[in-house]
């Protein structure tokens, strides 16, 4: 209860700050841009839906969004036009569990090779640079269901950053360069999928010459990329 109360107070203070900003030229109130950052954290990332709901209820405009891992999915959905209520409905339907189960909907199995329900392993060779060392990476869950889900979720946006209603970016981790990678253009589904490539759970995404894993490895709370990329007044 205390945490909820403090969160509500923070929202009210943010709303007051955003609404009460003064224009230095004539003293009138001017709108201030707000950027919202959504961290990773597995199922805990779904709490971001409540934060978005609280901000909207208190009249706080959301001009930019950024996210990592599960936070990237919620941020991208908001950017694509999903309301917090619609997100809650999707979560309540239980489909999120299906996304991460690795099980393919029987309706779609004719289009994919049959994948058993037991954990299956694939290996990739990961070049770590000048050291020449390589190690074996495995994934426990098929990424097919989540990839199909992302394609459906962002179909209206054509899978394109430029067609989003709210500017969005997400962060992945380049394991070759050992650094975070900011993604704010190109294939939206690919970007979100790479941002949530949890090691040993989902296979990494290969984008150009990069092997991308979950963004939380190097930047679980990407406030700096949002600040540099969009320059909002408030984060």
Can you say where each PLM-predicted feature lies in the sequence?
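Patatin-like phospholipase
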Residues: 2, 20-68, 76-235
């Amino acid at each position: 209860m205390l945490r909820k109360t403090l969160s509500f107070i923070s929202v009210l203070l943010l709303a007051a700050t955003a609404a009460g900003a003064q224009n230095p030229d004539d003293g009138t109130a001017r709108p201030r841009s707000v950027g919202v950052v959504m961290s990773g954290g597995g199922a805990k990332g779904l709490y971001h839906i409540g934060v978005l709901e609280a901000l909207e209820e208190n009249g706080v405009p959301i001009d930019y969004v950024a996210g990592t891992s599960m936070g990237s999915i919620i941020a991208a959905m908001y950017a694509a036009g999903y309301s917090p209520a619609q997100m809650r409905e999707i979560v309540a339907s239980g489909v999120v569990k299906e996304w991460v189960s690795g099980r393919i909907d029987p309706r779609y199995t004719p289009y994919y090779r049959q994948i058993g329900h037991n954990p299956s392993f694939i290996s990739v060779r990961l070049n770590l640079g000048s050291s020449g060392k390589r190690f074996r990476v495995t994934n426990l869950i098929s990424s097919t269901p989540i990839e199909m889900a992302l394609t459906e979720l962002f179909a209206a946006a054509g899978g394109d950053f430029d067609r989003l209603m709210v500017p969005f970016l997400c962060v992945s981790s380049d394991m070759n360069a050992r650094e975070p990678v900011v993604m704010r253009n190109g294939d939206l589904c690919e970007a979100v999928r790479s941002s949530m490539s949890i090691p040993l759970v989902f296979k990494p995404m290969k984008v150009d010459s990069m092997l991308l894993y979950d963004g939380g490895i190097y930047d679980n709370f990407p406030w700096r990329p949002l600040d540099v990329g969009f320059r909002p007044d408030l984060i």
